[in-house]
């Protein structure tokens, strides 16, 4: 490892040698890999923690005000909306913050989905998923410590929902979330930078649909954290198996569209010849040329946002 200031890497003046400067510029691949892994782990911990802390506090607030005289009563419409908004907006804002750091996954089912398409390496996934689980436990524990009363945000079946029904509800809703990630974040286009909004909306509508039936997990970490703090049910496995089944279902659907080269079926939609800027194509599928549009003269960078003309700005400042 290069150490600036050592005799081997400095000249008579005490300044770094040209070789030392070049080594620092090129970098140490092993050290860089370790640093990147650390950044990803820290990003996933911070993002998962903040997402779930805000979500748990919002959900706890809705649950304690839902029907104080009957804690087991079905959610009232305003309570349901409150919970859905808490999870959806908390996820959207934290994905927007951390997607450049770690990818903003915060969900083992999403991580599995990204591993399946090659967007996340299996080695990174082995670091990320335990980090997400620890962050979820931490968020649940702090929520329990901050707010009075019993922690109520554990997932549970309700209104006569069977275990089998719960598994498939979680599977289909998670598949919707993972497909949202695939087509808005993995597939690069001019609105990729708005993917956090779509992902948040997907979680919002999932909670509208399923909270009265399964409590809405769609995220094994979200279920695991509160269960560790407040206690497990006998059927907690449905909140782990269901979302992972949803990831597999979404991958199968996405794979079919990629094999069929879906881009050629409805050409020109959200497309500005992004192949020139390194459009990501998984599985090595070829993309047919698309007709030119009036925006083809814009060189898309940073998710399709045109670069500002710094020379013009500099001239104006002189």
Curated annotation (Swiss-Prot):
Residues 1-16 have a biased composition (Polar residues). GO terms for cellular component: nuclear membrane; plasma membrane. The chain crosses the membrane at residues 37-57, 78-98, 109-129, 166-186, 194-214, 237-257. A motif (NPA 2) lies at residues 219-221. Its main location: nucleus. It is a multi-pass membrane protein. Keywords: Glycoprotein, Membrane, Nucleus, Repeat, Transmembrane, Transmembrane helix, Transport. Residues 58-77, 130-165, 215-236 are extracellular. It is found in: Nucleus membrane. The keyword tRNA-binding does not apply. One of its GO terms (molecular function) is water channel activity. It catalyses: H2O(in) = H2O(out). A motif (NPA 1) lies at residues 107-109. Belongs to the MIP/aquaporin (TC 1.A.8) family. PANTHER family: AQUAPORIN TRANSPORTER, MIP17260P. Aquaporins contain two tandem repeats each containing three membrane-spanning domains and a pore-forming loop with the signature motif Asn-Pro-Ala (NPA). This is Aquaporin-1. It comes from Gibberella zeae (strain ATCC MYA-4620 / CBS 123657 / FGSC 9075 / NRRL 31084 / PH-1). The lineage of its organism: Eukaryota, Fungi, Dikarya, Ascomycota, Pezizomycotina.
